[in-house]
């Protein structure tokens, strides 16, 4: 046990942690030359293409140092803000962390939030400055930032390059020297912390865990504490690039368990595994249910695919327990599901995986967040969907979720960023200068304002330099109203949204203009209206396509022409009564892209 080192890598998106992990694997000869490819640990094609890590991964390396063999378990974590619960569980399974900072970009918001998480878990932190081979690297300035953040001596900061492999030996040596061996009692009742699960179509759900106390052996009868379910450990083993079965896994080590579990609901990240015969008295602290933050309706384009969509979502859920869904129906789109996601990136990824892995064409409605409605009778109702709002006469007030956000940016962009946050009803809490030209701004913002396009706008006004991190803070009463879109007087439920009263008129007007561009012209006029309750706040009209019926009259009496025009008008009127307006898929998504 004294030769085991468990560590994770903390970094902001794009600071090169997956590449550096590749170098560590190559250097310790964990991965043979023929298996080597970029981002070895990222299994999904989607992860490689986008260059992001979505799920946590784990891999075991062996390293000889001063004549002794050490086992290093690297637990790779996602860097994106949507997946911060996965990061927190991975961090809890480690004793040390490599803090990777890009020598060209410096410290970013995500780095800081994950670093605080590591410090709370008492991890030994090893600062590494990556990408020092870049021509745009600023090693001295970035070193100043790291020293200021960690308060460590300058000579402790390792310089490395994931691309050239420079500094990799120093990193491995430092891990062995500085990261403490896992603490734990091999004789105590079994306690294993689950930090991830993956779905294998042949063997069911495979849980990855770290043994905190005790020893787990093949064939043991075990119990998952949070769900209370019992299983037999058909196979346990360690994680190299592939799984290597072992007879037992001892205290402090990281491994996997296969026990024929069918659904991901039964394996919760953060849960504890213990023996049925000699159970641990309590679970490992820190387990929490992940609550979805963003909700959207997902509908099949062809309504006959409803059952296929259900099956696809269930399969996705096997691999991604944070995805929730329940059936709902819409007059405009037919039957579909109301899905809950951790954030916008998570939503995009689920959509893309539905398309790639299951060939499902889906329509997604406007994402919204959950609100708490207080009725005049004193009841509290949680609403995920604007259609679920009770009658306005019964509502006392509505609470909406607020987040606490921190934005790190160059001082050049402070003005535009503050304007953006104020436009999103943000409240400035404080601003702190990290170094001469970098500042951290703290805001309280309503989650509903951020959910659509805040991140994209932040990136574009700061030329990609600003970084953003947030966590849910609390619920606060707000003046919200349900905005309906009517086409020829008929409400289209899939386009309804909840907006703040102050922004509703401009939002309604922009929405109508956008829909006017996207809905194709018909044989009759189409009125697009935005309404709050019975009050119309904006209107646009799509003019009818019409034939020149008087073309065949040359000269002659005006009454002849009038007769033909009246006849056409009658026909158009009749068409309008029975005609329906097709809303194209583009129009549902356009709402997300209103500027």
UniProtKB/Swiss-Prot annotation:
Its main location: membrane. One of its GO terms (biological process) is positive regulation of translation. It is found in: Cell inner membrane. GO terms for cellular component: plasma membrane. It is a peripheral membrane protein. PROSITE patterns: G_TR_2. Keywords: Cell inner membrane, Cell membrane, GTP-binding, Hydrolase, Membrane, Nucleotide-binding, Protein biosynthesis. Residues 2-183 form the tr-type G domain. The keyword GTP-binding applies. It is an enzyme of class 3 (hydrolase). GO terms for molecular function: GTP binding; GTPase activity; ribosome binding; translation elongation factor activity. Its EC number is 3.6.5.n1. Belongs to the TRAFAC class translation factor GTPase superfamily. Classic translation factor GTPase family. LepA subfamily. Required for accurate and efficient protein synthesis under certain stress conditions. May act as a fidelity factor of the translation reaction, by catalyzing a one-codon backward translocation of tRNAs on improperly translocated ribosomes. Back-translocation proceeds from a post-translocation (POST) complex to a pre-translocation (PRE) complex, thus giving elongation factor G a second chance to translocate the tRNAs correctly. Binds to ribosomes in a GTP-dependent manner. This is Elongation factor 4. It comes from Parabacteroides distasonis (strain ATCC 8503 / DSM 20701 / CIP 104284 / JCM 5825 / NCTC 11152). The gene is lepA.
């Amino acid at each position: 046990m004294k030769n085991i080192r468990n560590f994770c890598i903390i970094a902001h998106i794009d600071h090169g942690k997956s590449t550096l992990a590749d170098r560590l694997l190559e250097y310790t000869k964990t991965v043979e030359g023929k298996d080597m490819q970029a981002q070895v640990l990222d299994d999904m094609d989607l992860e490689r293409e986008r260059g992001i890590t979505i799920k946590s991964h784990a891999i075991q390396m062996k390293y000889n140092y001063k004549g002794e063999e050490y086992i290093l378990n690297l637990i790779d974590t996602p860097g994106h803000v949507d997946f911060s619960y996965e990061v927190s569980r991975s961090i809890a399974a480690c004793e040390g962390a490599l803090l990777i900072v890009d020598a060209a970009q410096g410290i970013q918001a995500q780095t800081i939030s994950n670093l605080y998480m590591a410090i709370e878990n008492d991890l030994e932190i090893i600062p590494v400055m990556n990408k020092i081979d870049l021509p745009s690297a600023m090693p001295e300035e970035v070193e100043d930032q790291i020293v200021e953040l960690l308060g460590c001596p300058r000579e402790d900061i390792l310089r490395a390059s994931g691309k050239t492999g420079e500094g990799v030996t120093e990193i491995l040596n430092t891990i062995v020297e500085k990261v403490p061996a896992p603490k734990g009692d091999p004789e105590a009742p079994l306690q294993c912390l689950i930090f991830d699960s993956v779905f294998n179509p042949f063997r069911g759900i495979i849980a990855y865990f770290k043994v905190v106390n005790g020893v787990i052996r093949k064939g043991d009868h075990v119990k998952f504490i949070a769900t209370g379910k019992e299983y037999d450990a058909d196979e346990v083993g360690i994680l190299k690039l592939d799984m290597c079965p072992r007879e037992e896994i001892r205290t402090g080590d990281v491994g996997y368990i296969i026990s024929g579990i069918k659904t991901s609901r039964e394996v919760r990240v953060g849960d504890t595994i213990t023996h049925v015969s000699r159970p641990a008295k309590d679970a490992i602290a820190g387990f929490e249910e992940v609550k979805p933050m963003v909700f959207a309706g997902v509908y099949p384009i062809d309504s006959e695919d409803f059952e296929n969509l259900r099956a696809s979502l269930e399969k996705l859920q096997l691999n991604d327990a944070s995805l929730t869904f329940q059936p709902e129906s819409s007059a405009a789109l037919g039957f579909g599901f109301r899905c809950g996601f951790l954030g916008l990136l998570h939503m995009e990824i689920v959509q893309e995986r539905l398309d790639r892995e299951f060939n499902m064409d889906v329509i997604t409605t406007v994402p919204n967040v959950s609100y708490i409605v207080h009725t005049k009778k004193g009841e509290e109702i949680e609403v995920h969907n604007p259609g679920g709002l009770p009658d306005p006469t019964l509502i006392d007030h509505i609470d909406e979720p607020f987040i606490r956000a921190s934005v790190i940016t160059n001082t050049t962009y402070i003005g535009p960023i503050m304007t953006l946050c104020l436009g999103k009803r943000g409240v400035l809490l404080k601003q702190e200068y990290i170094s001469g030209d970098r500042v951290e701004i703290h805001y309280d913002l309503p989650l509903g304002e951020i959910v659509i396009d805040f991140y994209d706008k932040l990136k574009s006004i700061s030329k990609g330099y600003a970084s953003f991190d947030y966590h849910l803070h609390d619920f606060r009463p707000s003046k919200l109203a349900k905005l309906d879109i009517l086409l020829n007087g008929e409400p289209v439920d899939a386009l309804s949204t909840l907006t703040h009263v102050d922004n509703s008129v401009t939002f309604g007007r922009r929405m109508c203009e956008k829909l006017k561009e996207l809905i194709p012209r018909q044989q009759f006029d189409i009125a697009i209206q935005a309404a709050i309750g019975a009050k119309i706040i904006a209107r646009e009209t799509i003019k009818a396509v019409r034939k020149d019926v008087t073309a065949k009259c040359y000269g002659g009496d005006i009454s002849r022409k009038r007769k033909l025009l009246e006849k056409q008008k009658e026909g158009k009127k009749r068409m309008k009564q029975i005609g329906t307006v097709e809303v194209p898929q583009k129009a549902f998504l356009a709402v997300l892209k209103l500027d």
